[in-house]
Amino acid sequence: MKLRIAWIGRTRSPPIQSLTAEYLKRLSRYAACEALELMSEATLLRLLEKSTARTPPVLVLLDSRGLQLTSEEIANFLDYHQSHGTQELLFAVGPADGWSADTRAAANQVLSFGKITLPHELARVVLLEQLYRGFTILKGHPYHGGH
């Protein structure tokens, strides 16, 4: 299964760039992964339309109005998609003004990190860390020590 993590806009903060690179490296032990810096929400929709894969990617949006999952539930989500043959999970952190109705309608799942508002660059790192944590839970790695 391939993971693609997309976000709108460039990452300008060196510490965020460093954390992003570190978690992408860690994730690559468990799945092929790729980060995508997109210029706009429209670019994400075009990316979905142009997909040439046998099956389209499963689009998971991050949005404050989405479903809140525990780390264990994220692990179960990843496990479900691995065991059911999902070829690609495409996670997307939205633009500052939120996702449009069209993009929300195109999504297979909308997730949230809670009712708090995070800077978009920080939300990217939290997403990458939670995906990594999810895989370590599945593999019984000591990174996730419980609560």
Where in the sequence are the language-model features?
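Post-transcriptional modification and biogenesis factors for structured RNAs
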Residues: 1-147
